[in-house]
Curated annotation (Swiss-Prot):
Residues 4-235 form the ABC transporter domain. The gene is ugpC. Gene3D superfamilies: 2.40.50.100, Nucleic acid-binding proteins, P-loop containing nucleotide triphosphate hydrolases. Its main location: membrane. GO terms for molecular function: ABC-type glycerol-3-phosphate transporter activity; ATP binding; ATP hydrolysis activity. It is found in: Cell inner membrane. One of its GO terms (biological process) is glycerophosphodiester transmembrane transport. This is sn-glycerol-3-phosphate import ATP-binding protein UgpC. It comes from Jannaschia sp. (strain CCS1).
Amino acid sequence: MAQVTLTAVRKVYPNGAEALEPSSFTIPDGELTVLVGPSGCGKSTLLRMVAGLEEITEGELSIGDRIVNDIDPADRNIAMVFQNYALYPHMSVAQNMGYGLKNRGMDKAAISEKVREAADMLNLNEFLDRRPSQLSGGQRQRVAMGRAIVREPDLFLFDEPLSNLDAKLRNQMRIEIRALQRRLGTTAMYVTHDQVEAMTMADRIIVLNSGMIEQIGTPNEIYEHPASTFVASFMGAPPMNLLRGEASGGAVTLGGGQDVPFARADGHDGPIQVGIRPEDTWPDPAGDLAFDVDIIEELGAQRLLHGHVAGQAFSVAVPKDKSAETGAMKLSVKPGAVHLFDADKGRRL
């Protein structure tokens, strides 16, 4: 186990393209930190720099008490798990799991013991003699995890390990990976573009956008207090509603002169962006917001009402036992649930 520290780490490619702006953060010993963001945001580049697969242009990277900028990947005592499993098809499960230890010169008895221990954790004992082609996608991913576990690394690096699995298996493996990481207590960095994975698995989340860190925080901090409109719209399903508004004398209004309840923008006059999550508002004849419902989406446990507030797209999440119809209605908003952002840069006010 080890603490990971990045100090002003930057990545610039030879053509001058900046993949990652100078970035600094610390992952405490034993924590699972998730790097999340859209394609091209720099999350995989950052992970590859920690792994030693990408050269660091500027800055300093430490794993434990060692600065590892110039240390080869094989000597960093890390273990990676990829989305494509990277298993040898001609080897058995046991041989795949123990291959790295064999290359280190460990004796057969010790390798066998470590493989058996990892197989116990991952429920793979009955599959140790099988080839990868005889396994399901979830079982192959467990083998890849077992291969990482037997190395007893200071740091696990997960690069979108669940992307090739179907939705049901992703949910199952998400729980298994989190439980396993907690059991082992090994520091972990986990890359994903899926905000659900980030929210459900992380001790802390690092949200990246266009090579820049937008926000670092716990899942609750990210969700309850997004630092920007990007974070607000990217984290959460369905995403936060963002409306153009106007602030004057502390009050906030939308188009048509609609006042936004529970919103105060003291010290800020002019254009503003108003954020309200779909689950923080509900149909109420005595409500303050006029809402025109165009489409109702049935999701089983809840309904999503899609329409417009002040001529702008807006969605509302309601429980399945609440009736809803298309057309005009009023909405109430949960006190303290209105988020205000700068209209130009999108930063939280």
